[in-house]
Amino acid sequence: MSSKVRVRFAPSPTGPLHIGGVRTALYNYLFAKKHGGDFVLRIEDTDQNRYVEGAEDYIIEALNWCGIPYDEGPGKEKGFGPYRQSERKDQYREYAEKLIKSGNAYYAFDTSDELDGHRKDHEEKGKTFIYNWHNRQKLKNSLSLSQEEVQEKLDGEEDYVIRFKSPQDETLHLKDVIRGDMEIDTNILDDKVLFKSDGMPTYHLANIVDDHLMEITHVIRGEEWLPSLALHYMLYRAFGWNAPQFAHLPLILKPQGKGKLSKRDGEKMGFPVFPLEWKDPESGDISAGYKEEGYFPEAVVNMLAFLGWNPGTEEEFFGLEDLTKAFELERVHKGGAKFDPEKTKWFQQHYIQLADNEFLADEFEKRLEKKEIEADKIYISEVVALIKERVVFVEDFWDQGYFFFIAPTSFDPKDSKKAWKEGTSELMTELNEYLKSIDNFEAEHLQETVKGWIKSKEIGFGKVMMPLRIALVGALQGPDLYKIAEFIGKEATLKRIQKAVDTLK
């Protein structure tokens, strides 16, 4: 076993990478980087019936978008490849045969129909059928049959599987970095299939062999694999290999807190559960992705890091570098972590505030070009700086600042009713005439002069400022009104006031 920390993320290419998988990859990445180790990507594609075209590319693209690229894996050979299990399948039989020779595994010739019959018989008696020490001598396998019968079946190309021979009357002492010490009675374990009748290994065998050959020192994976921990420990022991350290991560739960977060939850409640958009190659259905929904990868990574872990302080905003320094497996929670879509938006809003204005202006300019709106880059940057604190996504810049680029095409009915009263049109006409006489349209000067004009009229500020906002914006929203007037300029300001008077009189 290598003294250097080596971890692996080993997804199956059966569809898009769920954010639960991204979190597993993230924790592996953080642990490896903290300890100066390697983060390995291995594609576990032994189940060819479930293989989905494009899924592997999606996984790699998703990791890169999140800023957690692998050090070693497909396309990044480092001497431990191949990194797709389908390309390693020839070696698995060799290891399965070693287990048979050492007495730790055996051939089983029971057909699916025969096993279904045994299950049915047990169910009728109120029992559960388990293929293990209790009944393996009564079943059709190389432990119950003579050597001649076994050889005859093998020579006759009869279908068979290879099963692990679980020990009887033993207490296994297991250790998990997150969950501590555990004990398992081997009498309750079944003899798991290690090699299938189609000539492909199961996850259990391929996983253990690959982890050993790739010198993986720490296996950090989801808690759904916790029931397999005993088998995996026994496999390491059967091969005479040192086992890596194991850490089983808690589930990501639905927002309500009950059950594992699923794709359906996202569809029903309107939030993504995938890092990138995914188009199903068969149905053509499109599932939303965080990237396409406008989230920054920094926000998604920060959110995922806190789904099951915390640094032990009040601080919640961590970039990748800070996460790497702070991350400890021992601080990962045992219990499930409830997913909160609003918390994700909260992280996103934080990171958009930190984003460089020039970058945001470039992104906003792309949106403006789609709307066939031309604007000076400096002007766009100034608008971005003014309304930045009001947005969560880049797309929000238009909703929060469209009036900097086009005049309102309509006026919000509810807001207009609230702001435009009897006599308002006459008052706004007077204001328009007054503004024509002002040459300096800078916000600070405008504020001083307009306030003076309102005071001279002996009326409340709301009677002028609310309808003025309706005229310039189209609704009772937006940043400082004098800034809006300064940005759009004197001519546009006068035109908008006149249009409001003509429309709302």
UniProtKB/Swiss-Prot annotation:
<dbReference type="InterPro" id="IPR014729">
    <property type="entry name" value="Rossmann-like_a/b/a_fold"/>
</dbReference>
<dbReference type="GO" id="GO:0005829">
    <property type="term" value="C:cytosol"/>
</dbReference>
<dbReference type="InterPro" id="IPR001412">
    <property type="entry name" value="aa-tRNA-synth_I_CS"/>
</dbReference>
<dbReference type="InterPro" id="IPR033910">
    <property type="entry name" value="GluRS_core"/>
</dbReference>
<dbReference type="InterPro" id="IPR008925">
    <property type="entry name" value="aa_tRNA-synth_I_cd-bd_sf"/>
</dbReference>
<dbReference type="InterPro" id="IPR020061">
    <property type="entry name" value="Glu_tRNA_lig_a-bdl"/>
</dbReference>
<feature type="binding site">
    <location>
        <position position="263"/>
    </location>
    <ligand>
        <name>ATP</name>
    </ligand>
</feature>
<keyword id="KW-0436">Ligase</keyword>
<keyword id="KW-0547">Nucleotide-binding</keyword>
<feature type="short sequence motif" description="'KMSKS' region">
    <location>
        <begin position="260"/>
        <end position="264"/>
    </location>
</feature>
<keyword id="KW-0648">Protein biosynthesis</keyword>
<feature type="short sequence motif" description="'HIGH' region">
    <location>
        <begin position="11"/>
        <end position="21"/>
    </location>
</feature>
<comment type="similarity">
    <text>Belongs to the class-I aminoacyl-tRNA synthetase family. Glutamate--tRNA ligase type 1 subfamily.</text>
</comment>
<comment type="function">
    <text>Catalyzes the attachment of glutamate to tRNA(Glu) in a two-step reaction: glutamate is first activated by ATP to form Glu-AMP and then transferred to the acceptor end of tRNA(Glu).</text>
</comment>
<dbReference type="Pfam" id="PF19269">
    <property type="entry name" value="Anticodon_2"/>
</dbReference>
<dbReference type="GO" id="GO:0000049">
    <property type="term" value="F:tRNA binding"/>
</dbReference>
<keyword id="KW-0030">Aminoacyl-tRNA synthetase</keyword>
<comment type="subunit">
    <text>Monomer.</text>
</comment>
<dbReference type="GO" id="GO:0004818">
    <property type="term" value="F:glutamate-tRNA ligase activity"/>
</dbReference>
<protein>
    <recommendedName>
        <fullName>Glutamate--tRNA ligase</fullName>
        <ecNumber>6.1.1.17</ecNumber>
    </recommendedName>
</protein>
<dbReference type="InterPro" id="IPR020751">
    <property type="entry name" value="aa-tRNA-synth_I_codon-bd_sub2"/>
</dbReference>
<dbReference type="GO" id="GO:0008270">
    <property type="term" value="F:zinc ion binding"/>
</dbReference>
<dbReference type="GO" id="GO:0006424">
    <property type="term" value="P:glutamyl-tRNA aminoacylation"/>
</dbReference>
<dbReference type="InterPro" id="IPR004527">
    <property type="entry name" value="Glu-tRNA-ligase_bac/mito"/>
</dbReference>
<dbReference type="InterPro" id="IPR045462">
    <property type="entry name" value="aa-tRNA-synth_I_cd-bd"/>
</dbReference>
<dbReference type="InterPro" id="IPR020058">
    <property type="entry name" value="Glu/Gln-tRNA-synth_Ib_cat-dom"/>
</dbReference>
<keyword id="KW-0067">ATP-binding</keyword>
<dbReference type="InterPro" id="IPR000924">
    <property type="entry name" value="Glu/Gln-tRNA-synth"/>
</dbReference>
<dbReference type="GO" id="GO:0005524">
    <property type="term" value="F:ATP binding"/>
</dbReference>
<keyword id="KW-0963">Cytoplasm</keyword>
<dbReference type="InterPro" id="IPR049940">
    <property type="entry name" value="GluQ/Sye"/>
</dbReference>
<dbReference type="Pfam" id="PF00749">
    <property type="entry name" value="tRNA-synt_1c"/>
</dbReference>
